[in-house]
Curated annotation (Swiss-Prot):
It comes from Halobacterium salinarum (strain ATCC 700922 / JCM 11081 / NRC-1). PANTHER family: OROTIDINE 5'-PHOSPHATE DECARBOXYLASE. InterPro entries: Aldolase_TIM (IPR013785), OMPdecase_AS (IPR018089), OMPdecase_type-2 (IPR011995), OMPdeCOase_dom (IPR001754), RibuloseP-bd_barrel (IPR011060). This is Orotidine 5'-phosphate decarboxylase. HAMAP family: OMPdecase_type2.
Length: 267
């Protein structure tokens, strides 16, 4: 089964397009997990228990795991999420040349999909694109304000903006390799709509709906492809919803359920 097929099946089973980000910031972890052998894993396990019924995917960000204990925590997290029947999309924004890209792509033996950076071109992405049954989400129009610095540049040779060109190339890669999607932020709803009109077949990962205040209605209307496959991510708005209370895991579950219901009203 391809990743997009797997994701579509999960979306149908959970009646959800919610991506729950798993970014266990050590400075914000609750006191009752801080003394665990692997605090990030202890935190993630409680979050997964509380939210998995509402999640189409879990999305750990690699930056929160890049030390020896962190990688152990990530391995446990991925295995546990899979045990709950939920795919894992690693937000790593990888790309490099030659052997380095091939090494980065090895992670797809353990997770179901990954985010990549298109700046180095197709050859830097081929090790990811050629992985069987693995999803590849290409950064296109990101949710941060600084994304305008480069993504909005006009390409005179193509009569389009850079982010539009990325979308077109991603559609070509999808036609050749399959299982390619785009990362398009909910904080730029006009661009989100424009990109969807260019590439109706691609699934989008749409961040920025939670703490960043993005447009949830636009995220659903334009984030899903013709088959209703796509993801709307919230991280801090879910996992730290109960940050200042003892029932923090239950608060995360409530936040994920509320987001699912909110998004489903627009599906």
């Amino acid at each position: 089964m391809s990743f997009v097929e797997e994701l579509g099946a999960r979306i149908e089973a959970a009646d959800s397009v919610v991506s729950v980000g798993l970014d266990p910031d050590m400075e914000r972890l609750p006191e009752d997990v801080q003394d665990a052998e692997l605090p990030r894993w202890a935190f993630n396990r409680r979050i997964i228990d509380a939210t998995h019924e509402h999640a189409a995917v879990f999305k750990p960000n690699a930056a929160f795991y890049e030390d020896s204990d962190g990688w152990r925590a990530l391995r446990e997290t991925v295995a546990y999420a899979h045990g709950k029947g939920v795919p894992v999309l690693l937000d790593a924004k990888r790309a490099d040349i030659g052997n380095t890209a091939r090494q980065y792509a090895e992670i797809l033996a353990h997770v179901d999909a990954i985010t990549v950076n298109p700046y180095l071109g197709e050859d830097a992405l081929q090790p990811f694109l050629t992985q069987d049954e693995a999803g590849v989400f290409v950064l296109c129009r990101t949710s941060n304000e600084g994304g305008m610095d480069f993504q909005h540049l006009e390409l005179a040779a193509y009569d389009r903006r850079l982010y539009e060109h990325v979308a077109e190339r991603a559609a070509e890669w999808n036609a050749q390799y399959g299982d390619v999607g785009l990362v398009v932020g909910a904080t730029a709803p006009d661009e989100l709509q424009a990109i969807r009109e260019r590439v109706p077949e691609l699934p989008f990962l749409v961040p920025g709906v939670g703490a960043q205040g993005g447009d949830a209605e636009a995220a659903v209307e334009y984030g899903l492809n013709d088959d209703g496959v796509g993801l709307v991510n919230s991280t801090r708005g879910v996992i730290f919803a109960g940050e200042h209370g003892s029932a923090w895991a239950a608060a995360a579950g409530d936040a994920a359920r509320t987001l699912r219901e909110r998004l489903n009203r627009h599906r």
